[in-house]
């Protein structure tokens, strides 16, 4: 399996998940559907303004207005939506309604993927029936080496949409991550996404508690996370693995989304910067 290097240190050893292809191009709106989650991962990077709170964000816009969500997607000419949280399946009715709304407005080609820690087939079936195209499971760390005790095998067997695993590459849990990927490969999971572990305002205490350190003074990435991801990628060549660096998320995905929005909505008198911001054109 060929390794393909991308910008900002990201790399993958096989085809990218369809949802990732849209993200790389800046085409995915991020729909944060709720900050509520029952998993309680110590490394969760969700900001304090969202974590544990029942709030909705369409990209950077805090809203509960359906038309504003559609407007935000239209403003960036979105080709798809990534539904995240918290755990979107905590409020399955809201998530189902959002999927239906987006599909009805933009059509079946609008690609929707969702992140969840929930392995409840009834809730999963509800979002699939609403039009979900891709689901990414985030099992809690305590399950990584014991996935055969979870219902994931049966879930994968009974789903017709793309199924992936997306977790951070924890530098001190290489063996558990290896076990998780081995299990995923054995049951036919379509892809693995490994995110570089990052410090944020809500998980900063893990630096002292788990003896984590920064890659360097200019980065929020945790030292050793990338090394673990590369180890897993080299060992598991029969399943597509994508390592997404912290700098890739900001330097490529976010930048491309901002550029896409600026190009789609800028006025004739505005100039778009390389970072995707809009400034007024000076007249002499």
Question: What residue ranges belong to the model's regions?
Answer:
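Short, electropositive alpha-helical surface patch
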Residues: 96-104, 189, 246-269
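Surface-exposed amphipathic alpha-helices with a cationic face
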Residues: 45, 95-107, 128, 152-159, ...
């Amino acid at each position: 399996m060929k390794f393909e290097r991308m910008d900002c240190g990201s790399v993958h050893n096989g085809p990218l998940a369809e949802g990732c292809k849209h993200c790389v191009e800046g085409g995915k709106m991020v729909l944060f559907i709720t900050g509520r989650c029952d998993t309680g991962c110590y490394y969760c990077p969700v900001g304090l303004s969202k974590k544990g709170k029942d709030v909705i964000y369409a990209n950077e816009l805090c809203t509960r207005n359906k038309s504003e969500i559609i407007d935000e997607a239209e403003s960036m000419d979105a080709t798809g939506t990534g539904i995240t949280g918290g755990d979107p399946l905590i409020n399955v009715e809201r998530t189902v309604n959002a999927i239906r709304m987006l599909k009805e407005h933009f059509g079946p080609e609008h690609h929707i993927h969702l992140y969840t820690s929930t392995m409840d087939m009834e809730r999963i079936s509800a979002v699939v029936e609403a039009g979900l195209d891709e689901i990414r499971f985030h099992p809690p760390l305590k399950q990584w080496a014991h996935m055969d005790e979870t219902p994931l095998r049966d879930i994968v067997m009974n789903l017709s949409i793309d199924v992936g695993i997306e977790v951070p590459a924890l530098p001190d849990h290489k063996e558990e991550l290896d076990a998780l990927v081995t299990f995923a490969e054995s049951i036919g999971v379509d892809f693995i996404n490994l995110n570089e572990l990052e410090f944020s305002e809500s998980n900063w205490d893990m630096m002292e508690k788990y003896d984590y350190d920064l890659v360097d003074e200019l980065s929020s990435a945790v030292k050793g996370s990338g090394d673990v991801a590369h180890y897993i990628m080299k060992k598991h060549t029969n399943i597509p693995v994508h390592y997404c660096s912290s700098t890739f998320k900001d330097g490529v995905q976010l930048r491309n989304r901002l550029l896409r929005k600026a190009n789609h909505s800028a006025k004739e008198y505005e100039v778009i910067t390389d970072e995707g911001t809009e400034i007024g054109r000076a007249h002499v």
